[in-house]
Amino acid sequence: MRRIVALRRIIWDAAGHFNDDDGWAMASYLAISALMAIFPFLIFATTLASFLGAQAFAETAVHLVFDTWPEQIAAPIAREVVTVLTVQRGDLLTYGVALAAFFASNGIEALRTSLNRAYRVVETRSIWYRRTQSLGFVLIATIGFVVISILLVFAPLIARFLEANFEWIKPYMGTITLWRFIIASTVIVLGLVAVHIWLPDGRRPLLDIVPGIIFTLAGWLIGSTLFATYLDNFSSYVTTYAGLASIMIAVVFLYIVSVIFILGGELNASIRRYLDARAKVGA
């Protein structure tokens, strides 16, 4: 009974603060910022990958970003992304690519702002530190994607070698699609851990952010599945928005994702507040 009461208090605190502190508006801000950051990030990443010799990066990047999205949502956007990424561009250090990196970092700043609100902290770090950190996130993500794309190029060769020399491993190899999904899911988990630890002001132990990350992953899975089912069976987006349907679908999907992401931070903050209150009472 005590656990039920505690769980209810935590959920009520998280949901109440989300509602009272403009959580719905912050989710809109985060969704639009994410949509505006995806294309600049992929343009910057593709240009850097080409500079480093990873010519097949565009297709791999699209898979890594969109493999975990429902197909009904990802397919129209992925086609446009591939079209954008296959356009030939100039050298790495052009103004356009530098601006792409800057606009991509705006998405990181949106994550920071929403998490600061969720964790109920006031930002104390300088704008230069924050911008440098955001650009660092973009650069690290880009390098990570390049490394993964190179590994996926060699994956079939490695798989054939392992299957030829280790018969017992065949049932566990799966398909390239499966491995892409596993890698994309791993990238998401590591990304969530990184943004919860380093983006908001202050410091939080790893154990403090685990509940919110689990909630976020479960919420994204359930939310995307329900939205995909809705699109399959009930949606009139195509007739209502015509050529804008794919953009509207992406915006609504990212809004759902953003609400769940912010609620994950709210949940972590509420659990910490509850535990701190219990500790004071015990003292």
Which residue ranges define each predicted feature?
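Membrane-embedded alpha-helices and immediately adjacent juxtamembrane helical segments
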Residues: M1-A283
